[in-house]
């Protein structure tokens, strides 16, 4: 029963991630990466990404509604 609950929460998290545009692996697109002829100092600061866990990202994007609180509580025990 616990496994079914975890699967349901993960499915919901995946659906929410798709809606809010969170990349599950939090990777930076190749276009923003420097190549051999571009040192890091030429990249704008905005291109630096911070890696957070999926759980943190979901909780941070939740609205303060009952549905959001329920999902956030469900995600919290997984992470």
From Swiss-Prot:
Task: Glycosylated residues: list them.
Answer: 25, 30, 35, 40
Which residues, per the entry, are lipid-modified as GPI-anchor amidated glycine? Answer: 55
> Which residues are trimmed away as propeptide when the chain matures?
56-79
Q: Which domain of life is it from?
A: Eukaryota
Alphabetical UniProt keywords: Cell membrane, Glycoprotein, GPI-anchor, Lipoprotein, Membrane, Signal
Region (Disordered) location = 24-44
Q: Name one GO cellular component term.
A: plasma membrane
Residue span of the signal peptide, if any?
1-18
Q: What is its main location?
A: membrane
Q: How does it sit in the membrane?
A: Lipid-anchor; GPI-anchor
Q: List the subcellular locations.
A: Cell membrane
Protein's recorded name: Uncharacterized protein YCL048W-A
- Source organism of this protein record: Saccharomyces cerevisiae (strain ATCC 204508 / S288c)
